[in-house]
From Swiss-Prot:
Domain TRAM: 378-441
Annotated organism of origin: Shewanella sp. (strain MR-4)
Location within or outside the cell: Cytoplasm
Family: Belongs to the methylthiotransferase family. MiaB subfamily.
Main location: cytoplasm
Subunit structure: Monomer.
Keywords (A to Z) from UniProt: 4Fe-4S, Cytoplasm, Iron, Iron-sulfur, Metal-binding, S-adenosyl-L-methionine, Transferase, tRNA processing
Function: Catalyzes the methylthiolation of N6-(dimethylallyl)adenosine (i(6)A), leading to the formation of 2-methylthio-N6-(dimethylallyl)adenosine (ms(2)i(6)A) at position 37 in tRNAs that read codons beginning with uridine.
Cofactor binding annotation: Binds 2 [4Fe-4S] clusters. One cluster is coordinated with 3 cysteines and an exchangeable S-adenosyl-L-methionine.
Boundaries of every Radical SAM core domain copy: 143-375
Name this polypeptide is given: tRNA-2-methylthio-N(6)-dimethylallyladenosine synthase
GO molecular function, one term: N6-isopentenyladenosine methylthiotransferase activity
Length: 474
């Protein structure tokens, strides 16, 4: 009877990536297979996020539900990872006695060892340290699950925005060596991946070591990835405006594999609030980045993050945010009502904006961005869009689902053979959350460029010594 693993994930794409690596790790080294049903699992892992309001209480509520399963099965192992575990490890241990393992984002690679410690009778094994880049050296080779893949290129953040817990839960910025990233993407491309999304809390701050002792910038890494045959689309998230340098903007001018869509969080359009947030830039500097981006890539579309009701935010401050939204013409946003995060400098500020006022401002902001997004979508009517076919349509499994460069879902009638490849479709209808397309041509009728085959990169790295032990070298 196979051993079962259940993982519940909350939060950002980095957490989704980490959870997939936990599954790979425990599958590779201990033979666990994933299950959607917590009731049939031998191990339950909760990968937590501390960004949202009442994150800690949400964790304890979930653990309370899992405790009933452990009462029935004392051999069940329960682990808590992610940012809440990193921040509140001792509190979790003291309050939730059903928890066996507590680990941080940088120590998930030690899960097999921690599980063995529990099997030997140890109680509440905790490791929320920050061993920098060690975890990437201990993870199994990547496994593709469809034509798109996330690849983590760096961890942590050193910006210390006044509202944010990330530097305290994931540590400061640490970049992976560039050769390791290129090798991982080449391995994914060999398995059929066509689009990669490069991940980091502050991804454009990437400065990775090269094999010859140099430093690879984020702009250089983008060009290296674009040269890998089979990788025809590159996305990245999340960026910080103060690291969005001209060399990155230049990549948009000469690298078509980099999509015409960018998520660049700004949080507020008020210079006064941006200063209180310790963002390190003003609204005019943000608009300067967007202006230069649109000069390099005229059709690029921008999404952002907004925090509504930050301490001290006046109606005039909110009006500045709405003015920025109009000036930039954002296509999408993730917008939230401010709530204090324990341990951050902003938590000491008086939360003096009325909750009803916050809700009204949030509704106004979201309504405006929805209008702008629909305007962009309507402009796509009648155009031919190249989409990457990801699988069957969610609502109608007899149809296919793909995604445009500007991150819109398109449903269309097509043959299953197109899954995992690019097709051109004409946009024939527009909905709030998706588009309707008509199939025009398949990939066999396109002229997709070929530069550097993944097998060339793998061969370059792979070397067998006299004993037949495989090593990977630059």
């Amino acid at each position: 009877m196979s051993k079962k693993l259940h993982i519940k994930t909350w939060g950002c794409q980095m957490n989704e990536y980490d959870s997939s690596k936990m599954a790979d790790l425990l599958g590779e080294y201990q033979g666990y297979t994933l299950t959607e049903e917590a009731e049939e699992a031998d191990i339950l892992l909760l990968n937590t996020c501390s960004i949202r309001e009442k994150a800690q209480e949400k964790v304890f509520h979930q653990l309370g539900r899992w405790k009933t399963l452990k009462d029935k099965n004392p051999d069940l192992i329960i682990g808590v990872g992610g940012c809440v575990a990193s921040q509140e490890g001792k509190a979790i241990k003291d309050r939730a006695h059903c928890v066996d393992i507590i680990f941080g984002p940088q120590t998930l690679h030690r899960l097999p060892d921690m599980i063995e410690q529990v099997r030997r009778g140890e109680k509440a094994v905790i490791d929320v340290s920050f061993p920098e880049i060690e975890k990437f050296d201990r993870l199994p080779e990547p496994r593709a699950e469809g034509p798109t893949a996330f690849v983590s290129i760096m961890e942590g953040c050193s910006k210390y925005c006044s509202f944010c817990v990330v530097p305290y839960t994931r540590g400061e910025e640490v970049s992976r060596p560039s050769d390791d990233i290129i090798l991982e993407i080449a391995q994914l491309a060999e398995q059929g991946v066509r689009e990669v999304n490069l991940l980091g809390q502050n991804v454009n701050a990437y400065r990775g070591a090269t094999h010859d002792g140099g430093i690879c910038t984020f702009a250089e890494l983008l060009r290296y990835v674009a040269a890998i045959d089979g990788i025809d689309r590159i996305r990245f998230t999340t960026s910080h405006p103060i690291e969005f340098t001209q060399d990155i903007i230049d990549v948009y001018e000469d690298t078509p594999e980099l999509v015409s869509f960018l998520h660049l969080p700004v949080q507020s359009g008020s210079d006064r609030i941006l200063t209180a947030m310790k963002r390190g830039h003003m609204a005019i500097e943000y608009k300067s980045i967007i202006r230069r981006l649109r000069k390099a890539r005229p059709d690029i579309q921008i999404s952002s993050d907004f925090i509504i009701g930050f301490p001290g935010e006046t109606k005039e401050d909110f009006a500045d945010t709405m003015k920025l939204i109009e000036d930039v013409a954002f296509d999408h946003s993730f917008s939230f009502i401010y709530s204090a995060r324990p341990g951050t400098p902003a938590a000491d500020l008086p939360d003096d904006v009325d909750m009803e006022e916050k809700k009204q401002r949030l509704a106004i902001l979201q309504d405006r961005i929805t209008q702008q997004a629909m305007r962009y979508s309507r402009h796509m009517m009648g155009t031919v869009q190249r989409i990457l076919v990801e699988g069957p349509s969610v609502k109608n499994p007899m149809e296919l689902r793909g995604r445009t460069e500007n991150n819109r879902v398109v449903n269309f009638e097509g043959l299953p053979k197109h899954i995992g490849s690019f097709v051109d479709v004409e946009i024939v209808d527009v909905y709030t959350n998706s588009l309707r397309g008509k199939f025009i041509r398949g990939e066999d009728e396109m002229d997709l460029r070929r530069n550097l085959r993944p097998s060339d990169i793998l061969a370059k790295h792979k070397q067998d010594d006299d004993l037949g032990v495989t090593q990977f070298k630059p």
